[in-house]
């Protein structure tokens, strides 16, 4: 477990924002690093040739930076997300419901590895789920053939 995630010295001193309860950027970054490595290597996600190509086109360190920035911002931290919108980043990838499910399984595996407390886990899942309409944009789950 990342030492600071979900730990505080007493209920009275319990941080109010999710960002603070997660331990800030230095606790969030290793979780994001693990998750990004996991999704970039997931053969179920890379079976989508558009996702596979994107995973090989982007710099893993840049991708991790932007996702860390976004998680920090979305959880109430002082960071500002500077990347593209979720829609603009994913519209061309034709991500399916099934691929979203694999993505969420990878997220759960990362949360398990870092022993993320259930309340923080639920809040983060809610944040991630709020992005689904801008990410899952394929018209159906059958892989389209490209010429």
What are the residue ranges of the model-derived segments?
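Core of compact, soluble alpha-helical bundle domains
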Residues: 1-147
């Amino acid at each position: 477990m990342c030492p600071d995630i979900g730990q505080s010295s007493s209920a009275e001193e319990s941080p109010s924002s999710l960002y603070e309860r997660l331990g800030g950027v230095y606790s969030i970054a290793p979780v994001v690093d693990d998750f990004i490595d996991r999704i970039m290597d997931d053969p179920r996600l890379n079976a989508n040739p558009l996702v596979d190509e994107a995973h090989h086109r982007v710099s893993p360190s840049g991708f991790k930076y932007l996702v860390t920035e976004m998680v920090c911002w979305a959880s109430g931290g002082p960071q500002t997300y500077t990347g593209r919108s979720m829609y603009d980043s994913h519209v061309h990838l034709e991500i399916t419901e099934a691929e979203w499910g694999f993505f969420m399984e990878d997220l759960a595996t990362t949360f398990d590895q870092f022993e993320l407390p259930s309340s923080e886990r639920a809040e983060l899942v809610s944040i991630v789920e709020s992005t689904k309409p801008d990410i899952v944009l394929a018209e159906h789950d059958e892989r389209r053939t490209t010429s």
